[in-house]
Amino acid sequence: MADRCLLYYITDRSQFPGDERTRRRVLLATVAEAARARVDYIQLREKDLSARELEMLARDALTAVRNSTPLRTENRELRTRLLINSRTDVALAAGADGVHLRAEDVAPHDVRHVLEVSTHRPLTTDHFLVAASCHTVADVFRAESEKADFAVFAPVFGKRGGAGTPPAGLAALQEACRAKIRVLALGGVTIDNAASCLEAGAAGVAGIRLFQENKIEDVVRALRAL
């Protein structure tokens, strides 16, 4: 079991009520709440936005994170870190802490190579995180070989309503966690079943509704007590 449960909030403003302006305001407030509660990572996953719109939202989200971090520090390892879904270009333009790559995106080691060439220095987790979405055990080991910093394995328990990819289950999660990179569990994870993910070897848990439909401070307190 992980020494400290890593927590990964994935955003989805479409779940919030109201018009677009209201949803963005609520999203940024939720991002700030997550930073205050010391969630480790936030993934800005607003896939419908254009690159320019996403960059603007990412800058606002970064401001919300930095203004809400209890330690008031610029040390990225000591505050909530913001990753952008899929768009490495937007992550770099906005000054985000990393990118979360989908299975169909450029491989993690290629992202690292481009960044190392452009910055003339080795890419470390202090500078930029590269996370990878994984849906099979093989995906996780591929992410490890391609130098991802961590993998998000999903869906473990399935999505609400039962639609989409069938749940992989805890046995598959346990097998995936044999990889040397950190693996976070996603998909139907709740406060009640998160402990079973950690017992399977996960370094932490990720979710959308887990954070957006609950008071984040309470979620963090419960999960960090596991």
Regions found by a protein language model. Name each.
Residues 1-71, 76-116, 126-149, 165, ...:
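Conserved N-terminal beta1-alpha1 strand-loop-helix module at the mouth
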Residues 105, 156-158:
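Short glycine-rich anion-binding loops that position phosphate/pyrophosphate groups of nucleotides
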Residues 149-156:
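Non-cysteine beta-strand/loop elements that form the S-adenosyl-L-methionine
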Residues 205:
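C-terminal binding/interaction regions
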